[in-house]
């Protein structure tokens, strides 16, 4: 399966039990910042934004004072899982980032999708990739 198929079929799909509820944008990005696959709506990010995200995984709390920035959008960092998941909130939407051995799985959402639904979609794919050694 191509990386694009993971984004299209496992991240940008209808959320279980909620037809027409899906993430706003999604991507799989290597730890080095190279995009493996992304939705057409995923924001163009700056290298320093990706560096900040990677630093927060190795030094949890790094982004808390400044917020998480992606594509020029600032998210308030909310409770995640140190070294494994970063979650951010902005207005009625937000972001979930799951770290795997080689990649970061991104999901961005807006209402009516809930934070819990975004977390489930992103973390389920991230856990699968971890199980595959990726």
From Swiss-Prot:
PTM comment, free text = Phosphorylated by MAP kinases.
Q: Name one GO molecular function term.
A: actin monomer binding
* Cell compartment(s), UniProt: Cytoplasm, Cytoskeleton
Output the Gene Ontology cellular-component terms: cell cortex; cytoskeleton
Q: Which keywords does this Swiss-Prot/TrEMBL entry list?
A: Actin-binding, Allergen, Cytoplasm, Cytoskeleton, Disulfide bond, Phosphoprotein
> Where is the motif named Involved in PIP2 interaction mapped on this chain?
84-100
Recorded hits in InterPro entries, A to Z, give: PFN (IPR048278), PFN_euk (IPR005455), PFN_sf (IPR036140), Profilin_CS (IPR027310)
User: Which cysteines are disulphide-bonded?
Assistant: 13-118
Where would you say this protein principally sits, based on its record?
cytoplasm
Phosphothreonine occurs at which residues? 114
Keyword 4Fe-4S among UniProt keywords: no
- Function of the protein: Binds to actin and affects the structure of the cytoskeleton. At high concentrations, profilin prevents the polymerization of actin, whereas it enhances it at low concentrations.
Which PANTHER family does the UniProt entry name for this protein? PROFILIN, PROFILIN-5
The entry's family comment says: Belongs to the profilin family.
Its subunit composition reads: Occurs in many kinds of cells as a complex with monomeric actin in a 1:1 ratio.
| Additional remarks | The variability of the residues taking part of IgE-binding epitopes might be responsible of the difference in cross-reactivity among olive pollen cultivars, and between distantly related pollen species, leading to a variable range of allergy reactions among atopic patients.
The identity of this protein, by name, is: Profilin-2
């Amino acid at each position: 399966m191509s990386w694009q198929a993971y984004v299209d079929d496992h991240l940008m799909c209808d959320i279980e039990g909620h037809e027409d509820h899906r993430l706003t944008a999604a991507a799989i990005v290597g730890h080095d910042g190279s995009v493996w696959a992304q939705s057409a709506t995923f924001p163009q990010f700056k290298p320093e934004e990706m560096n900040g995200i990677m630093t927060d995984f190795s030094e949890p709390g790094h982004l808390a004072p400044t917020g998480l920035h992606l594509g020029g959008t600032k998210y308030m960092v909310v409770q995640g899982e140190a070294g494994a998941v970063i979650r951010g909130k902005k207005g009625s939407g937000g972001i979930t980032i799951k770290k795997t051995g080689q990649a970061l799985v991104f999901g961005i959402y807006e209402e009516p999708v809930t934070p819990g639904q975004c977390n489930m979609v992103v973390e389920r794919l991230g856990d699968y990739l971890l199980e595959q050694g990726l």
